[in-house]
Amino acid sequence: MKKITLILCATILCSVASAQYRPDVLGAKFEQLTIDQPDGKDGEKIVTTLVRHTPLEEVSRAVLYVHGYNDYFFQEEMAAKFIEQGWQFYAVDLHRYGRSMREWHTPFAVSNIEEYFEDIDAAIDQMEAEGMEQIILMGHSTGGLTTPLYCHANRKALRVDALILNSPFFDMNLSSGFAESVGSPFVSFMGSIFKNWAVQKGKETPGGYGRSISDKYDGEWPFDTQFKRVESLPITAEWFRAIHRAHRKLQKGLDIPCPILVLYSDKTISGEYDKELYMSGDAVLDVKDIAKYAAGIGSNVTQIEVAGGIHDLVLSRPEVRYPLYDQIFEWLEF
């Protein structure tokens, strides 16, 4: 029986390691792997997509990047920076996002943030099968909410050696204390009953943040606007409930055993769109919330406030993001 078990395990590992990558939309330096997941509700077919930069030879340390809401992996420069520093680079497009979106999916739909744990596990399984022995998990925005919860849930057998959070979504950025203390719990409760209720309507015109980063408007960065909309989609009560419940869990404190680096802008900005303004601060989250809750997610947390950083810090202006990379790689020498 033991021999049969070993043979089965070896067969599974060989199958995973030999999985077929194919060319990625980002071009010659990237390739992608589609990983089938268990069917979703009502038999919905679900997949995860793992993207990797052309691998370095004989390197067994790697970064796994997890994107945010209304997002996917497109940050080629970030991948190149890690490669230059001797890190393999991988990114995951979560189910119902980006490369993992299928025509029958509702974009970004989720009822519990923990649904994304399967995407992360599948990515790490594949990375380990490819020989990765040291893995740094990196999450941005909603990915920066999912990844610490993942690390906490798996803390007794964590396969992650460090966690980097880029403007993590630790709390709702609402207009008043009443909205946060009364409105959020109410909408969250209603989300258990009226799941498709649109608590926030979408906008057909580009938002300020989208305009500030897209090369089709005032920004520097090319990305697929079908995968990352510059306008906003409606937010459902079910999605709001999933986020609210995740926030409550994180805000009570986590016990993540690995070193954590939390990065955020020095200021939150809002108001009518102005190019200079929107390129100088976080137009999505309240950075004070990030600073408030960061210290409570583990025992080894480093916080860095990034002057002039925008919401996705690695998309900030060159004079902001290049020194930021230096800080990240210096921290990774732990």
Task: Specify the residue positions occupied by each region the protein language model found.
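Catalytic nucleophile-loop/oxyanion-hole region of alpha/beta-hydrolase
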Residues: Y69-N70, G98-Q134, V320-R321
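Serine-hydrolase catalytic core
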Residues: V199-V301, E305
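Alpha/beta-hydrolase-fold enzymes
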Residues: T142, T146-I235
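Short beta-strand element of the alpha/beta-hydrolase
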Residues: S60-G68
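Conserved alpha/beta-hydrolase
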Residues: D71-F74, A79, I83-E103
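Short beta-to-alpha linker loops that shape the active-site pocket of alpha/beta-hydrolase fold enzymes
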Residues: Y69, D93-G98, F169, A307-I310
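Catalytic active-site module of serine/aspartate enzymes centered on a nucleophile-bearing elbow/loop
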Residues: N300-F334
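N-terminal cap/lid segment of alpha/beta-hydrolase-fold proteins
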Residues: Q20-E57
